[in-house]
Amino acid sequence: MKFEAVVRTELGKGASRRLRLAGQFPAVVYGGEAAPVAVALNHDDIVNQMDKPEFYEAITLVIGGEEVKVKPQDVQRHAFKPKVEHMDFIRI
């Protein structure tokens, strides 16, 4: 599986809310020797694939033209809506 991710320049609660209203959600890619990277992902693309078992294995994020192999580490969901609020990915 391969997903496009955009590096976030604005961080914080307000920026995250604007992302969610635009149909995206914030995420963090960390682990390995590289520094953590804050990214934004398309909500519908991710949610449609989350039901598949392959999603929780190795997936590829394309961040600024560079492919990064990651694995979902943590998913924060909305309390009663079928929405993802935030995700953490760990580099493989």
From Swiss-Prot:
One of its GO terms (cellular component) is cytosolic large ribosomal subunit. Keywords: Ribonucleoprotein, Ribosomal protein, RNA-binding, rRNA-binding. Pfam families: Ribosomal_L25p. Signal peptide: none annotated. The keyword Zinc does not apply. One of its GO terms (molecular function) is structural constituent of ribosome. Gene3D superfamilies: Ribosomal Protein L25, Chain P. GO terms for biological process: translation. Belongs to the bacterial ribosomal protein bL25 family. This is one of the proteins that binds to the 5S RNA in the ribosome where it forms part of the central protuberance. HAMAP family: Ribosomal_bL25. Part of the 50S ribosomal subunit; part of the 5S rRNA/L5/L18/L25 subcomplex. Contacts the 5S rRNA. Binds to the 5S rRNA independently of L5 and L18. This is Large ribosomal subunit protein bL25. It comes from Vibrio vulnificus (strain CMCP6). The gene is rplY.
